[in-house]
């Protein structure tokens, strides 16, 4: 497996990844302790993952992805782009506190997670009050979370959860591509599909004050 072979130095399975907790900068990236460390929850095929790593070479990036094929696609894109600041792990985001120590991470990106729209499935949604409280402890003050989804049902539900969390809402829209944030936005592969189908993109930015 590439997780323990070709990409072993930048791709970690469920057993190896927690060993980096509190030590991602020093042990994985050999970077200065002050260098920002961002996290993408659910990298998909890695278009945003590689873009972020390449355009923000002054920041580190760790991706979380459960599915093996997109995980490898993601790290391969970053490596092929010459990025030395990206790593990825096959790990369930609900257990993200097993990967990072309190105050270890900076910005968090959550793009188009499964909306779990079945009436019995909201408990599986990652953006919820409990996980936001968890992320709040892991992030440095001043850091933000970007959350994008095509599902208005999930977005409205998540906004209720967000308002019960410690985060401050910096920007919120139900139509990202007709908002003041459109020029700052990078379109993911899923996003391009949704836009072609005429689906509006919901977006919120939260900040740890």
From Swiss-Prot:
<keyword id="KW-0808">Transferase</keyword>
<comment type="similarity">
    <text>Belongs to the class I-like SAM-binding methyltransferase superfamily. TrmB family.</text>
</comment>
<dbReference type="InterPro" id="IPR029063">
    <property type="entry name" value="SAM-dependent_MTases_sf"/>
</dbReference>
<comment type="pathway">
    <text>tRNA modification; N(7)-methylguanine-tRNA biosynthesis.</text>
</comment>
<feature type="binding site">
    <location>
        <position position="65"/>
    </location>
    <ligand>
        <name>S-adenosyl-L-methionine</name>
    </ligand>
</feature>
<dbReference type="InterPro" id="IPR055361">
    <property type="entry name" value="tRNA_methyltr_TrmB_bact"/>
</dbReference>
<dbReference type="GO" id="GO:0043527">
    <property type="term" value="C:tRNA methyltransferase complex"/>
</dbReference>
<keyword id="KW-0489">Methyltransferase</keyword>
<feature type="binding site">
    <location>
        <position position="40"/>
    </location>
    <ligand>
        <name>S-adenosyl-L-methionine</name>
    </ligand>
</feature>
<dbReference type="InterPro" id="IPR003358">
    <property type="entry name" value="tRNA_(Gua-N-7)_MeTrfase_Trmb"/>
</dbReference>
<feature type="binding site">
    <location>
        <begin position="188"/>
        <end position="191"/>
    </location>
    <ligand>
        <name>substrate</name>
    </ligand>
</feature>
<keyword id="KW-0819">tRNA processing</keyword>
<feature type="binding site">
    <location>
        <position position="114"/>
    </location>
    <ligand>
        <name>S-adenosyl-L-methionine</name>
    </ligand>
</feature>
<dbReference type="GO" id="GO:0008176">
    <property type="term" value="F:tRNA (guanine(46)-N7)-methyltransferase activity"/>
</dbReference>
<feature type="active site">
    <location>
        <position position="114"/>
    </location>
</feature>
<feature type="binding site">
    <location>
        <position position="150"/>
    </location>
    <ligand>
        <name>substrate</name>
    </ligand>
</feature>
<comment type="function">
    <text>Catalyzes the formation of N(7)-methylguanine at position 46 (m7G46) in tRNA.</text>
</comment>
<keyword id="KW-0949">S-adenosyl-L-methionine</keyword>
<protein>
    <recommendedName>
        <fullName>tRNA (guanine-N(7)-)-methyltransferase</fullName>
        <ecNumber>2.1.1.33</ecNumber>
    </recommendedName>
</protein>
<dbReference type="Pfam" id="PF02390">
    <property type="entry name" value="Methyltransf_4"/>
</dbReference>
